[in-house]
Amino acid sequence: MQKSIYKNIYLKILAIFFTMLNIANIYIFDNIRLFPNLDIMIIFFFTICKIRVFPIWFIFILGIWSDALNGINIGISSLLYIILIKLFIFFNYPEKNINDFGKNIILFVLFLSILLILKTGFLSIYTGKIYYLYHILIEFFISIGIYAILSSILLKYNREE
């Protein structure tokens, strides 16, 4: 029991650390700035693939903090995280833990695409600015590549226990 409490604390610290890493944007060219989306990867993996590792209140706090660090209107990320997580858990509930690498990647692609479309749409409506599609697509594909590596490591780590 004590080992699982420490593991849960370590995972929350990892999620907080990845949320802080989203401050360090990746600049490809002068006008293309990308977010690594590491916090989204950890939130997805430990709420949808491994159900209920992170409670909803923790995801809400991570979303608020992520918005504040990135200068986005506070609350949009939290709202979208919680709605999408509840929706994905509802449709994926019969298969509580996903240990299949392929299905894990497919679900992440679907989750990330819906999240980026909704977040970009809400921000475009709220700020009145139009966000460039190629920025979103590059961020999307880079995030999928990073998640494939991160997911394989996390799946291997969870199978060993």
Regions found by a protein language model. Give the residues of each.
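Terminal, non-globular segments
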Residues: 1-161
